[in-house]
């Protein structure tokens, strides 16, 4: 997999601090704090840890309190940034170049076609961007904030919507974030339990697992060819969500992947050998003690 995504345009932005905000309808959002500093980084350089962190946030949702879940999701966002749901959900991250936003089936928005301004309002609930749209024509002004202007200049070759995801007034709904982490952990659990208990399942149960796995998917990253020391494929990720989802998918399908589920604490971890079933000696000892009862 390293070779497959050796060349990737995957720079992302996280802020030094995020905060909770509630809109007029009582929905909670995570958004950069007013004085937070944007930090540009490459999430694919540490993709294994990022996927592991995402899975464990999702896995802990099943058993943890609301407070701990909120803390875990905020911790992930602080470490890696918001997921870029605005560019991940539509059929194309360049949706601003079209008359409307076209959306495949998803958990969050039922409409298949949506007015661009209405769609943007889902991600800018507090401070609207200075954005004008008329048919395919659009105009976006960034005024006053030199840091935001610098970010826009840095990512000027990317779709406008992706750059908007990096703005200080961009926000993502907490319940949408929570559902995304749930989906990832459900897929991971399904893949683990299917092969762990396959011999004990009837065919109807197997089909339920298969259907659940088949529903996992999303938009594929775009790519282009470049002539370097030799022709290379350059993959382009326009959202952190897509980067995580693609890396996770390849881990699941990779026969040599060391990604496992601890039989004791039910956390995801990477094994050092095929015989390992526990993330730590403490978990192994606790599991053995439990089985003695």
Give a label for each model feature.
Residues 287-293:
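Contiguous alpha-helical segments
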């Amino acid at each position: 997999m390293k070779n497959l995504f050796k060349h990737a345009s995957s720079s992302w932005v996280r802020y030094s601090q995020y905060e909770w905000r509630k809109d007029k309808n009582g929905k909670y959002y995570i958004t950069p704090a007013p004085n937070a500093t944007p930090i540009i980084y490459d999430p694919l350089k540490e993709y294994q840890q990022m996927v592991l962190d995402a899975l464990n946030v999702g896995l802990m949702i099943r058993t943890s309190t609301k407070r701990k879940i909120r803390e875990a999701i905020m911790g992930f966002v602080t470490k890696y940034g918001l997921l870029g749901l605005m560019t991940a959900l539509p059929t194309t991250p360049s949706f601003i170049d079209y008359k409307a936003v076209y959306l495949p089936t998803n958990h969050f928005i039922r409409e298949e076609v949506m007015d661009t301004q209405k769609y943007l309002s889902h991600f800018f609930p507090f401070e609207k961007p200075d954005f004008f749209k008329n048919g395919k024509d659009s105009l976006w002004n960034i005024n006053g904030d030199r840091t935001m202007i610098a970010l826009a200049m840095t990512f000027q070759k990317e779709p406008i919507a992706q750059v908007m995801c990096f703005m200080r007034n961009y926000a993502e709904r907490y319940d949408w974030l929570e559902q995304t982490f749930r989906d990832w952990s459900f897929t991971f659990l399904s893949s683990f339990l299917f092969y762990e208990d396959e011999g004990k399942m009837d065919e109807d149960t197997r089909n339920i697992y298969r259907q659940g796995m088949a529903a996992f998917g999303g938009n594929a990253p775009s790519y282009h060819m470049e002539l370097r020391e030799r022709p290379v494929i350059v993959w382009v990720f326009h959202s952190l969500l897509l980067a995580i989802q693609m890396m996770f998918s390849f881990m699941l399908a990779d026969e040599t992947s060391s990604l496992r589920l601890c039989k004791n604490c039910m956390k995801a971890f990477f094994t050092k050998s095929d015989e390992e079933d526990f993330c730590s000696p403490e978990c192994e000892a606790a599991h053995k003690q439990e089985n003695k009862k």
